[in-house]
Amino acid sequence: IRGGNMVGILAFEFEPIKRKSLLKSLKGITQRLCKKNAIDPADIGLMVHTGTYRQNFRQEPAFAAHLQQALDIGCANIGPTSKHTFSFDVSDGACGPHHALETIADLFPVIGCKYALLTAGDCRPNKETPWPHRPISFAAIISEDGPLQILDTRFDYEQENDFTSSTKFNKKYHTEAFTSKPHITK
């Protein structure tokens, strides 16, 4: 087993979106988390958002970039001594949160920041799209040494194949096999 990094949740919160926009909901949650936990938002150097549905089914710009701008994190002029914030989306349906956590764990040592922000949520794509859902928004502040250690990305490359992703959740070894078979439609 080689590589891998441990990350933990320092703080998290979720709420129904209701009539608020996803952006306003996540901005409010993030600000509350930072205030409750005495976290300087400027110490967030990585932002990853995951979700399936976006307004008008748009892919770019990334939702995380909109949230970064709304929170005014790392938006100052860039210079040799300025703090930078890397933000992007991971859209992979139900696997999105899992992949977002793996991405954060892998990028922490490279980016060298104190905290990462993981957000998740969906919004109604447009007024024409049927929307029977009551979506929630979720935000978590992740650190390399949070009290709730949730992900260890060490991987046994001896067992690797094209259909296996291994990770360790809650200190239990967990393997997921992903296969795809063609479906014939008439």
Predicted stretch roles:
Residues 1-17, 28, 103-112, 117-125, ...:
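Cys-dependent condensing catalytic cores that perform Claisen condensation/acyl-transfer
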Residues 1-52, 59, 65-76, 145-186:
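Conserved "HGTGT" condensation-loop signature of ketosynthase/thiolase-family condensing enzymes
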Residues 43-51, 79-88, 114-121, 151:
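Beta-strand segments within the central parallel beta-sheet cores of soluble alpha/beta enzyme folds
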Residues 54-114:
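Conserved catalytic cysteine-centered active-site region
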Residues 55-57, 124-128:
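Short, well-ordered, mixed-charge alpha-helical segments that flank or form enzyme active sites
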Residues 119-123, 142, 176-177:
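Conserved, well-structured core segments that form the ligand-binding/active-site neighborhood
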Residues 131-133:
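Internal gly/pro-rich beta-alpha loop/helix module
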Residues 137-143:
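Short beta-strand scaffold segments in enzyme catalytic cores
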